[in-house]
């Protein structure tokens, strides 16, 4: 998970929590001259062989005390995390995936030199090394004021990063096997407001009745626009879809039945998707 944000496995349990690469440059999308901070994880991915294994053995001995009385499964989940961490430290693949310096200047220019382009390229490297799910958080779209300046600043970097990713995946023969999803949480109000207190420059507020999502790759029938709003982008007037439909489509592309139910730790059945259907015409 590139950048911290809204993450966590919730009722799936801690064994499914993401590995987070906590960088502090996520608000610098529009500053292409910003010197990119190298991932701190690179400094720790040094092979130390016997030293690491010795620490693991000591930890296992200490954990056994709690393991005998653990009823929640948290120790088992922690075991999985620890093993994954050891594998990362001892494997050169992890270090290689995070090391953007191995890429050519031309390719880095294709994605854009700002942090968003940098971490989108890193996402491709992770997928190339076998990571099955990567999230790149590109925040700071909550423009209740100064929306014109904000969008003019950020949209070019988003456009370049996404376009560069799709072009790169296509050239490497990875696009048909990689689903790219670009989306947020909701849309913005059709009408401008007068800005926020202390910042009297127009912006837009939260709007749940309409938004846009980009789906690319994954073997989808792309080059289409599915659905439409009225001329003011207030509400759908054709082919209205819901977030559950987007989720059902993603699960279907991944080969997971969206109608699946699973049990949480309390034994309660939890549906993957509530009433959603995969989007017709793009599968």
What name fits each language-model region?
Residues 1-283:
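Ligand-binding pockets and gating/stacking loops
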């Amino acid at each position: 998970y590139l950048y911290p944000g809204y993450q966590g496995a919730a009722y799936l349990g801690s064994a499914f929590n993401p590995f987070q690469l906590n960088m502090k440059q996520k608000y610098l999308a529009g500053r292409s001259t910003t010197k990119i901070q190298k991932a701190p994880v690179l400094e720790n991915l040094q092979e130390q062989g016997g030293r690491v294994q010795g620490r693991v053995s000591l930890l296992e001995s200490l954990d056994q005390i709690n393991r005998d009385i653990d009823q929640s499964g948290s120790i088992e989940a922690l075991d999985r995390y620890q093993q994954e961490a050891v594998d990362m430290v001892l494997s050169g693949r992890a270090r290689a995936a995070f090391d953007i310096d191995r890429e050519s200047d031309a390719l880095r220019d294709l994605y854009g030199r700002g942090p968003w382009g940098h971490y989108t390229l890193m996402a491709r490297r992770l997928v190339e090394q076998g990571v099955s799910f990567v999230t790149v958080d590109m925040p700071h779209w909550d423009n209740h004021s100064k929306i014109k300046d904000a969008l003019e600043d950020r949209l070019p970097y988003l456009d370049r990063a996404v376009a560069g990713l799709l072009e790169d995946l296509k050239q490497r023969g990875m696009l048909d096997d990689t689903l790219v999803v670009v989306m947020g949480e909701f849309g913005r109000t059709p009408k401008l407001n007068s800005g926020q207190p202390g910042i009297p420059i127009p912006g837009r507020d939260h709007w749940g009745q309409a938004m846009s999502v980009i789906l690319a790759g994954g073997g989808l029938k792309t080059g289409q626009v599915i659905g439409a709003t009225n001329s003011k982008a207030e509400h759908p007037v054709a082919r209205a879809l819901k977030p559950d439909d987007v989720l059902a489509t993603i699960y279907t592309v991944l080969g997971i039945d969206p109608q699946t139910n699973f049990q949480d730790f309390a034994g309660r059945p939890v549906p993957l998707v509530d009433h959603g259907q995969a989007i017709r015409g793009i599968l």
